[in-house]
A protein has these predicted regions:
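ER/secretory pathway lumenal C-terminal domains and tails of membrane proteins involved
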Residues: 2, 101-107, 134, 139-148, ...
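N-terminal membrane topogenic signal
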Residues: 4-18, 213
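Membrane-interface starts of transmembrane alpha-helices
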Residues: 11-15, 73-84, 112-124, 169-177, ...
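Alpha-helical transmembrane segments
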Residues: 13-26, 122-126, 176, 217-225
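Transmembrane-helix motifs of polytopic, lipid-linked glycan transferases
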Residues: 17, 83-111, 153-157, 422-429
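Extracytoplasmic catalytic/substrate-binding loops of multi-pass membrane glycan-assembly enzymes
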Residues: 31-43, 53-64, 301-303, 533-537
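Loop-to-helix entry region of an early transmembrane alpha helix in multi-pass inner-membrane enzymes
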Residues: 59, 71-94, 98, 114, ...
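Short helix- or helix-capping micro-motifs
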Residues: 121-129, 181, 185
């Protein structure tokens, strides 16, 4: 090895280290300070207590998370576990830099352009570092950051193996890769998608090149992929069920002996195969942590996989139902029975022909759904977010790419120009021109970690959240091509120049330009949106929801976001452990019902036998009145609550969760207070509205329908907030202790609202929608006071809401709610606040014609602001005339308006004309009023009312 080669290797490693430090600093500075929404609360809690999370479990992540939770770097356990993500994500970027170098070296192995190779790789890796999805994963506790690292590590190792193929110890790389893949099964099955890429790199390195062998290699790789998934991941538990633990142990011992024998006998291929399988199994053995801990019954023990049959169900993700590639799950996909009829045999199994008919039912709809939703919206849009830009699809300059008006589309201007995308596309062409084998291998990796997932998952619409985090490995693969594109572009520029000095100068200039316009521009553009500093919304909402509940309550929650953060507070922070958090989705499962019964058997609220629980299922139901016993008092003299219960499933049945809610209400017999979180859907509240009393972030079940809200508790919770006031206006990390003294692990009224009024703290639209639950509470409290003629308290509630979360920082997504706020302000005499909200309303992008008319009338009737009403109705009138002209010239289709919509416009026109006339009249704009009325009368000569108005204007003008 030459001196220059040694020096360049050291420089390469040094740059990789610097990349780690830079990216870690960025990720750490933007890291979530505590628990976040979605799965993070569950993962942090289960890591800390070594519990059992939702299938398929991610045991390796839990073990690493447990280690980090023990490092005393913060009093906040979530902060400790969170810090692993910035570390592992920064390591991923360092590996990506090395991988880019490997691919460029395979195109140009000379040392002449080593500097430019490294800087091209540096720019590409930093570009990926600051893409949306990778950065999102890097700042919270989730498996995807760790999974991305494992993918990068496997790619790096197989590329290193191909470089060392002539060394005597090259096989160790393949063995190590097998172990990493085994370990990665304890994270996410996404890592298995690298296997076809690995197979192709091996084939192109040592195989005899032919189309037949290439196809066989790819097929063999897929066999290995499904073999690991079916034989090892799913098969070992089934094998254990057949052989028992003793039999399985004996089989493993035999395998170890055979492996040792093959190594000593120099049977190379056999030894590699046996060693690889053994190491995959050893890596996979992290799942023993899940099964062992489940047997010890931790407080979070999802699916209870402590027996072999339950473990098999857990690994198969049976909880989520059967996954099928066909048919694609387009909207209104008919049921299988409605298409192919009842099952053909006596065992309720559909025949092969029936399955085939259903798979290929309505191919045009399937194809349309596959492209328009699953590929275009749920992958291509995400891909373009990374390298072109992300923005509100309601913006006229943002391409929707399948997104609805309240979702993010593709903002081609976010990074100035989509240079990263252009360089990546150039890199693909350059790669295929210079090294078709590597390019094809990389293309397979790109497709397997992107489009192939789309085909396999067959997601239905709509999804509860954006799913871009699942395709980060695909985006990382594209970033390798960005590095190749930069390198090829620099070579093209320098090759076009004659003098060497000019070549060097131009190369340095181009590198500087790329660094400036790609990673730096992306860093600046994405920083605020990915900065979680000061974001305590999940922690605070969980705390506030728990503190809404009286001691020893039962709290029904809806899904991940109103359950996992609560689990975190209870299991990790030990806050309000007396509250029973009963997740409605999980109440559909027998294991969860059994766990709730056993965990709280000292003060039971589920009095069901094992047989009753196991027989739980849907119940056919027709709407009818039902009753449950209730305490007798002055508000309830009959001693029961009665209400009409409607079907909740397809209009014909009650779900298991509904039956369990009814059973819990009955068995509890009013011993424990029962609450429904405000996030629970109306359907899941089972029409109990008349007996649900709002107390903050939860509705309490009461025995009467006299009051829809509890004013005293609402005021105590919403208006008597705890913590230092500075939290609302500024973020100061030195004030942690002030807040910590005020929170209570026991029942205490008073909410926390940290940083909701701090413009420096980014609140994404989804979080913005979640915190509207606070606003709803404030508004309902205010309206309650208003109806009781207590106008001072009504106004005070709204003013406190404005102080805590001003609409200028966290917009009000519901126009109906904001109009209610404006109306209450008007009712209490605060015209300035009313006008402020009305002006915000008319600037919204989601308004319909009737909204503009309503708001314009409000400016006239309640605010007497004729300048504003004039602007509104002039705009509406001009739009009417433009639409009319367009329809006359181009027709309805080209104008993109339906005949029904045009009829609505025509029916509204007289009112628009009249309200615009009123605005002109009160502003003494008589000329404009005359022109308006004359134009109307010319088209409607029989309108005597308009003629009277015109006469009125003429009289006013003459006087």
């Amino acid at each position: 090895m030459s001196f220059f080669t040694t020096y360049s290797k050291k420089l390469e490693n040094l740059i990789a280290g610097v990349i780690f430090l830079i990216t870690f600093a960025v990720y750490f500075s933007t890291m979530a300070p505590t628990v976040s929404f979605w799965d993070t609360g569950e993962f942090i809690a289960t890591s800390h207590i070594l519990g059992v999370p939702h299938p398929p479990g991610s045991p390796l992540f839990l073990l690493v998370g447990k280690f980090f939770s023990l490092i005393p770097i913060s009093s906040d356990i979530a902060f400790r576990v969170n810090i692993f993500s910035p570390i592992i994500s920064a390591l991923t970027i360092s590996l990506l830099f090395l991988i880019c170098n490997q691919f460029i070296d395979r195109i140009d192995p000379s040392d002449n352009n080593k500097f430019f190779k490294m800087w091209s790789s540096l720019t590409a890796s930093l570009t990926f570092a600051f893409t949306h999805s990778h950065w999102f994963n890097a700042v919270e506790t989730e498996v995807y950051a760790f999974s991305g690292f494992m993918t990068a590590l496997v790619v790096f190792l197989i590329m290193r193996w191909s470089q060392k193929i002539h060394d005597s110890n090259h096989i160790i790389y393949l063995i190590f890769i097998s172990y990493i893949i085994g370990l990665a099964t304890g994270l996410h099955l996404l890592n298995l998608l690298t296997i076809p890429f690995i197979g192709l790199i091996i084939y192109f390195s040592i195989g005899k090149l032919s189309t037949k062998n290439l196809i066989l290699t790819f097929i063999f790789s897929l066999i290995i992929f499904f073999g690991i998934q079916s034989v090892i991941i799913k098969g070992l538990p089934q094998l254990t069920a057949s052989l028992g633990l003793v039999g399985l142990s004996f089989l493993i011992i035999l395998w170890v002996i055979a492996t040792i024998y093959s190594i000593k006998s120099n049977k190379t291929f056999l030894s590699i195969f046996l060693s690889s399988v053994l190491l995959i199994v050893i890596g996979y053995s992290t799942y023993f942590a899940i099964f062992i801990r489940s047997g010890q019954n931790p407080n979070i023990d999802e699916n209870n996989p402590e027996t072999i049959s339950e473990a098999i169900s857990y690994l198969n993700r049976d909880q989520y139902g059967q996954m099928t590639i066909l048919p694609r799950k387009f909207d209104n996909l008919p049921s299988k029975v409605s298409i192919v009829g009842s099952p053909a045999d006596d065992n309720s199994q559909f025949s092969f022909d029936q399955e085939l008919d259903y798979m290929f039912h309505d191919i045009p709809s399937q194809a349309s759904f596959l492209w328009n939703y699953q590929i275009k919206k749920m992958y291509l849009r995400y891909f373009l977010w990374q390298f072109a830009g992300k923005g509100d699809s309601g913006d006229p300059f943002v391409a929707s790419v399948g997104a609805s008006s309240d979702e993010d589309g593709v903002d081609w201007r976010q990074f100035g120009l989509p240079i990263a995308l252009i360089m990546g596309l150039i890199g693909i062409g350059y790669h295929f021109r210079k090294n078709k084998q590597d390019a094809f291998s990389l293309l397979i990796l790109f497709l397997m970690t992107g489009i192939a997932i789309i085909f396999y998952l067959n997601q239905d619409a709509p999804q509860p959240r954006e799913r871009d985090y699942a395709y980060v490995a695909s985006f990382m693969t594209f970033s390798i091509w960005i590095g190749l594109g930069i390198y090829s572009f620099i070579n093209f520029i320098t090759d076009s120049l004659l003098e060497k000095s000019i070549k060097l100068q131009s190369s340095y200039f181009m590198i500087g330009l790329f660094i400036l316009f790609m990673p730096t521009r992306m860093l600046i553009a994405n920083y605020h949106e990915h900065d979680r500093t000061g974001n305590y919304i999940a922690w605070d909402m969980a705390y506030n929801m728990l503190q809404t509940c009286e001691p020893n309550s039962i709290l029904f929650t809806n899904g991940d976001n109103d359950t996992f953060p609560l689990w975190y507070l209870q299991e990790v922070e030990q806050i309000r452990t007396d509250v029973v958090v009963a997740n409605l989705s999980l109440l559909n499962t027998t294991w969860y019902v059994e766990q709730l019964r056993e965990r709280y058997k000292d003060n039971p609220f589920i009095k069901m036998s094992d047989k009753e629980i196991q027989s739980l299922d849907f119940k056919r139901w027709e709407s009818k009145k039902i009753s449950i016993n209730a305490p007798k008092d002055s508000n309830n003299e009959i001693g029961k609550i009665e209400w009409e219960l409607n079907p909740t499933y397809l209009g014909v049945a009650l779900r298991t969760q509904d039956l369990m809610v009814l059973r819990i209400i009955n068995d509890n017999n009013w011993n424990r207070p029962i609450y429904f979180g405000v996030t629970v859907s109306p359907t899941s509240m089972l029409n109990l509205d008349n007996y649900l009393q709002m107390e903050g972030l939860a509705y309490r079940l009461v025995n009467n329908s006299n009051q829809i809200i509890n004013q005293n508790k609402m005021s105590d919770n919403l208006l008597s907030y705890i913590g230092d006031n500075s939290w609302f206006t500024d973020y100061d990390s030195n004030k942690y202790n002030l807040l910590d003294r005020d929170i209570s692990k026991e029942y205490q009224r008073g909410y926390i609202f940290r940083n909701l009024a701090n413009e420096k703290v980014y609140v994404d639209p989804q979080l913005g929608r979640l915190v509207q639950n606070y606003r709803t509470g404030f508004v309902r409290l205010s309206i309650s006071h208003y109806l009781n003629k207590d106008f001072q308290k009504a106004e005070a509630a709204l003013l406190k809401m404005e102080e805590i979360m001003p609409s200028s920082i966290i917009p009000i997504p519901s126009k109906q709610l904001q109009y209610q706020i404006a109306q209450v302000y008007s009712g209490v005499g605060n015209q300035a606040k009313m006008k402020y909200h009305m002006k915000e309303l008319v600037e919204r992008k989601d308004l319909l014609l009737e909204d503009y008319i309503l708001y314009g009338k409000t400016f006239i009737q309640l605010l007497e602001d004729y300048d504003e009403s004039k602007l509104i109705f002039e705009t509406i009138y001009q739009n009417y005339k433009l639409i009319e002209q367009s329809i006359l010239r181009r027709g309805f289709t080209a104008t993109k308006i339906s005949e029904k919509e045009w009829q609505d416009w025509q029916q509204s026109l007289p009112e628009i004309i009249y309200l615009l006339f009123l605005s002109y009249k009160n502003l003494e704009m008589y000329d404009e009023a005359k022109i308006l009325l004359n134009d109307w009368i010319n088209k409607n000569p029989a309108d005597d009312n308009a003629k009277e108005l015109l006469e009125e204007i003429l009289q006013l003008e003459s006087s």
